[in-house]
Amino acid sequence: MPGNHHPDDVSSVLRELVAAGRFQEALARHRAIGDPVLRQRAEVQLLAATAATRLGELSLAVSLAEGALDRFRSRGDRDGRMRAVNLLGAIAFEHGKLDIAERCFGEALLLAHDLDDNLMEARASNNLASLAVLRGRPEAALSLYRSALLAYSKLGDRRGTTEAYHNLGITFRLMKEWQDSQDAAAQAIRHAELVGERSLLALAVMGRAEIELERGDRDLARQELERASALAQEAGDAVGSAEVQRLTAVLAIAQGDYPTGLRLAQEARAVAERFGGVLLRAECHAAAARALRGLGRTVEAEQHRAEAARLFESLGAVRWLEELRREWS
């Protein structure tokens, strides 16, 4: 992208690419900006940070989002500051830094309320709900997710609606409310299909696969995992592909195919370590521990179990830690 483009033109191009789910192209466009002043404009940096976050390049995303936040603060731009801290909260969540994430989401929610920004209020509520799920407070999460869903629906934001339904599906699944979880997952897929973004659709399909896996419908779970894998690969979504691998590992282990389960869990963990996803890393260690125990490799199994427990504990992931302890008691 030549350096003599007008800043607003550059922002518009990046915004369109991000909105279309073309995150790799957006990041490539940002890297190609010749003018360093233009490349470091707050809005341009924040859009590039959003693309990097969606691609799982979290270290780059932090650097870009923090740069944008500094510039927004220096010029007293509360709207920009709100969007930047919300994104930094999402990145901190993926890195397992939940106290930082909660602080960022709380700040974003307060700013959104002051600015009467209903969309950001919905996003911040959605993000705070995800923290509540992780910390074992599903009832609190349901209330926040429903508030976010209502706001997204009123605003006509299909991406947000997809994410809220997907998260409701997860929460109902954790509560063993199968019909509600299936209904929410179906709605997530319907809205994701209307958005037309492959990585978002992969996420929604994966949500349904995990529900069916826990319900015991392994054939349907496999079909949905195959679909999610193809979508994530088409989107160039490495982290999404790793999530599919982890679930496919869980399926293989449930069917007694421990070698395949171990291989897939280890491959997914390598991706999680590269991109800094702590929860995914912990879940991969837990899956590897189950596979190794099935193979009779008890010493290695215990090592992976202990590492999974350590990571779950560091996250405050109450439900995940309790489930692991039940399995190994």
What does each model-identified segment do?
Residues 177-277:
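Eukaryotic tandem repeat interaction scaffolds
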Residues 34-37, 73-77, 94, 111-117, ...:
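Short coil/turn linkers that connect adjacent helices within long alpha-helical scaffolds
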Residues 1-13, 263, 267-270, 274-329:
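C-terminal non-catalytic interaction modules
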Residues 1-85, 109, 314-329:
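Flexible inter-repeat linkers and adjacent short helices
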Residues 18-19, 46-54, 79-94, 119-134, ...:
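Conserved alpha-helical positions within TPR/SEL1-like repeat arrays
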